Amino acid sequence: INWKKIKSLIKAAMS
């Protein structure tokens, strides 16, 4: 699991 990618996706979704 790529946490950096997932974290980026979550950040983008919360934007």
Curated annotation (Swiss-Prot):
What processes does the entry annotate via GO biological process terms?
defense response to bacterium; defense response to fungus; innate immune response; killing of cells of another organism
Q: In which tissues is it expressed?
A: Expressed by the venom gland.
Q: Where in the cell is it found?
A: Secreted
Q: Which domain of life is it from?
A: Eukaryota
Main localization is: secreted
Q: What does this protein do?
A: Antimicrobial peptide with high activity on Gram-positive (S.mutans, and S.aureus), and Gram-negative bacteria (S.enterica), as well as on fungi (C.albicans, C.glabrata, and C.neoformans). Shows a potent hemolysis on human erythrocytes. Together with phospholipase A1, stimulates prostaglandin E2 release from murine peritoneal cells and macrophages. Its mast cell degranulation activity may be related to the activation of G-protein coupled receptors in mast cells as well as interaction with other proteins located in cell endosomal membranes in the mast cells.
Q: What is the protein's name according to its record?
A: Mastoparan-V2
> Native species of this protein?
Vespula vulgaris (Yellow jacket)
